[in-house]
């Protein structure tokens, strides 16, 4: 007892000492809290909402969550005005029948608008901490049997309703998976695709549908489930159906979406758990129940017997792997030398996998097509796809090899393919430089190059780009610091065979590079494309806005996937317009270059002021538009950047 009493006295003395010490600290109330814990003044500005779930439980069938919201600087967000709360549970794999995949069951949602109505109990503790208790009781759902042993999920959509003081709030999503009684993490999950994979093409998943409401793929997967949406709108069916017919190289491989990621621990389900619904969403001509296109399967119980994980993965990724293996086997190196008679000599060497030149004759019978396109003036080509009104000349398109045979005018010299172009419209400045874009298409089977036959499968190989001058001086080259092809590969893959079919197909790699970025890494540019995508357009002479400056905007705008400049552009090189003339914007009509480029995305009338008053010519004649090409005054006021192309100088 004496020792216990002594201890109590000691504690009291220690507490008194601490109190006295704090009193002598100049009246400071201490720090606002450790990093990561809300405290102090609320966030004055909010670009990002970060959610942390502190407690999630279901009591007698009623879900409740406690959560913390901070901004990008870890400051507490106070006064959120409108949220939607949704509840779901996850049926495990096999629970509804042998071979069946796991499946979300969506109980419902409640929208809480502080200024109007709130079905449940919403508490804002005014320090970044919030809580919500649902009004709905999951046990009362007539369609779904609540099971407290299953993994549970609560999702939050925070609306972009401004805070009471007017602070703007971004639309945001968050979710938590938990066990009903303790709130602990469940022992199984269904996180098959990471939002990061979606954003590789979409940049922001929120822009795809539903007015920007849902930016997390897990929200999509939880809502688009049987019983909540109609047949065919289930997430695994809908997404495959939407993407399967897109001509994007990256979608040839399931792993473009189903990739290993901490946010998608179940990414391997695509090959591990085959079902009729999932497989049939891509293989849409198969009717498993009727036995059409496949042996009859009335349920999923027997799928895995044939379609084991390794074999399924090999079938679906093998094509891409084989293509990469073929592409790696050969390369090209080319030179272009201008001659006094205005011709140019093009010499193409075939390289082995190690970059060593080989005798082209040794692989000639395996070449389906070696195609070359030559033009003059890399920054503003003066040879049209068809004859240009300016130079009177069209690009020089020449196959050096076709179906294993040398073409007319082509010779083999010391194992290299040599061709002399017709006379080119050389001039001074940029037009002292000619350039040739080269594509190579090889016959192949699996991972092997094979002799070409009438019905040979083919693989497009690494493209090459060569420059040459008549003067002998260093060539001029088009800027490549605005769009790096790596951004194209995000959607189209690194084996994208550009224009294969009409052309040999061009696979863009470091082989076409002639510049490096700030880190010394080779830039894979897209400048070779202007050999065909000339200022005078392509085959339609402007009617399809085929000039390179416009074509990519037009085609990607039509598809609706590209909605932000930053999805493709790492920079804008506005100085490039100083060396451009007019661009063909309709059949036989031309527009000054800045305006032509802008109107490939924006309708002229939407720009908001008379373009002609700013020096522009819209759909004028060739001479008129080219004379005015450097008279546009757009950049006197406008200073567009990839992150804000509406920016103006103030």
From Swiss-Prot:
<dbReference type="InterPro" id="IPR020014">
    <property type="entry name" value="Decahaem_cyt-c_OmcA/MtrC"/>
</dbReference>
<dbReference type="Pfam" id="PF22113">
    <property type="entry name" value="Mtrc-MtrF_II-IV_dom"/>
</dbReference>
<protein>
    <recommendedName>
        <fullName>Multiheme cytochrome MtrC</fullName>
    </recommendedName>
</protein>
<dbReference type="InterPro" id="IPR054337">
    <property type="entry name" value="Mtrc-MtrF_dom_II/IV"/>
</dbReference>
<feature type="signal peptide">
    <location>
        <begin position="1"/>
        <end position="21"/>
    </location>
</feature>
<dbReference type="Pfam" id="PF22111">
    <property type="entry name" value="MtrC-MtrF_N"/>
</dbReference>
<dbReference type="InterPro" id="IPR036280">
    <property type="entry name" value="Multihaem_cyt_sf"/>
</dbReference>
<dbReference type="InterPro" id="IPR054334">
    <property type="entry name" value="MtrC-MtrF_dom_I"/>
</dbReference>
<keyword id="KW-0732">Signal</keyword>
């Amino acid at each position: 007892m004496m020792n216990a009493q002594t201890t109590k006295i000691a504690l009291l003395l220690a507490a008194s000492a601490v109190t006295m010490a704090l009193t002598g600290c100049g009246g400071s109330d201490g720090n606002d809290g450790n990093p990561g814990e809300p405290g102090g003044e609320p966030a004055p500005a909010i670009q990002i909402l970060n959610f942390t779930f502190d407690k999630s439980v279901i009591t007698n069938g009623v879900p409740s969550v406690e959560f913390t919201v901070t901004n990008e600087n870890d400051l507490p967000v106070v006064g959120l005005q409108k949220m939607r709360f949704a509840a779901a549970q996850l049926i495990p794999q096999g629970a509804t029948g042998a071979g069946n995949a796991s499946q979300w069951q969506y109980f419902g949602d409640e929208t809480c608008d502080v200024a109007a109505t709130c079905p449940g109990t919403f508490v804002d503790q005014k320090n970044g901490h919030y809580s919500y208790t649902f009004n709905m009781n999951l046990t009362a759902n007539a369609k779904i049997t609540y099971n407290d042993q299953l993994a549970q999920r609560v999702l939050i959509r925070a609306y972009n309703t401004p805070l009471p003081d007017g602070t703007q709030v971004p639309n945001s999503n968050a979710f938590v998976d938990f066990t009903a009684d303790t709130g602990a993490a469940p022992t199984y999950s269904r996180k098959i695709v990471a939002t990061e994979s979606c954003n590789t093409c979409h940049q922001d998943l929120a822009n795809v549908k539903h007015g920007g409401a849902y930016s997390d793929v897990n929200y999509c997967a939880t809502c688009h489930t049987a019983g909540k949406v109609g047949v065919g709108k289930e997430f695994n069916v809908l997404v495959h159906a939407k993407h399967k017919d897109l001509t994007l190289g990256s979608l040839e491989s399931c792993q473009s979406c189903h990739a290993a990621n901490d946010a998608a621990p179940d990414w391997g389900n695509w090959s591990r758990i085959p079902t009729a619904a999932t497989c049939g969403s891509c293989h849409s001509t198969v009717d498993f129940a009727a036995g059409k296109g496949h042996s009859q399967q009335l349920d999923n119980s027997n799928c895995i017997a044939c379609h084991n994980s390794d074999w399924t993965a090999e079938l679906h990724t093998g094509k891409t792997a084989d293509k990469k293996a073929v592409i790696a086997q050969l390369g090209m190196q080319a030179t272009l030398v201008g001659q006094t008679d205005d011709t140019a000599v093009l010499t193409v060497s075939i390289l082995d996998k190690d970059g060593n030149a080989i005798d082209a004759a040794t692989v000639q019978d395996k070449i389906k097509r070696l195609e070359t396109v030559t033009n003059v003036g890399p920054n503003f080509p003066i040879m049209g796809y068809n004859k240009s009104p300016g130079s009177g000349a069209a690009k020089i398109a020449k196959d050096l090899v076709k179906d294993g045979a040398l073409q007319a005018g082509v010779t083999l010299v010391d194992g290299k393919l040599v061709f002399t172009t017709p006379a080119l419209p050389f001039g001074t400045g940029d037009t002292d430089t000619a350039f040739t874009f080269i594509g190579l298409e090889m016959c192949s089977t699996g991972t092997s190059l094979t002799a070409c036959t009438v019905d040979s499968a083919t693989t497009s190989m690494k493209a090459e780009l060569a420059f040459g001058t008549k003067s002998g001086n260093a060539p001029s080259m088009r800027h490549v610091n605005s769009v790096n092809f790596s951004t194209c590969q995000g959607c189209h893959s690194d084996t994208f065979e550009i224009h294969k079919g009409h052309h040999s197909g061009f696979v863009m790699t470091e082989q076409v590079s002639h510049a490096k970025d700030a880190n010394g890494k080779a830039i894979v540019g897209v400048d070779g494309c202007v050999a065909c995508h000339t200022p005078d357009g392509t085959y339609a002479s402007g009617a399809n806005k085929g000039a390179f400056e416009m074509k990519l905007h037009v085609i990607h705008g039509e598809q609706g996937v590209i909605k932000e400049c930053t999805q493709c552009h790492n920079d804008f090189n506005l100085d490039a317009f100083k060396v451009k003339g007019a661009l063909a914007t309709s059949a036989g009509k031309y527009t000054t270059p800045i305006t032509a480029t802008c109107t490939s995305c924006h309708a002229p009338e939407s720009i908001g002021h008379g373009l002609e008053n700013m020096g522009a010519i819209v759909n004028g004649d060739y001479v008129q538009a080219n004379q005015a090409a450097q008279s546009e005054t757009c950049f006197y006021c406008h200073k567009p950047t990839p992150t804000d192309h509406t920016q103006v100088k103030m």
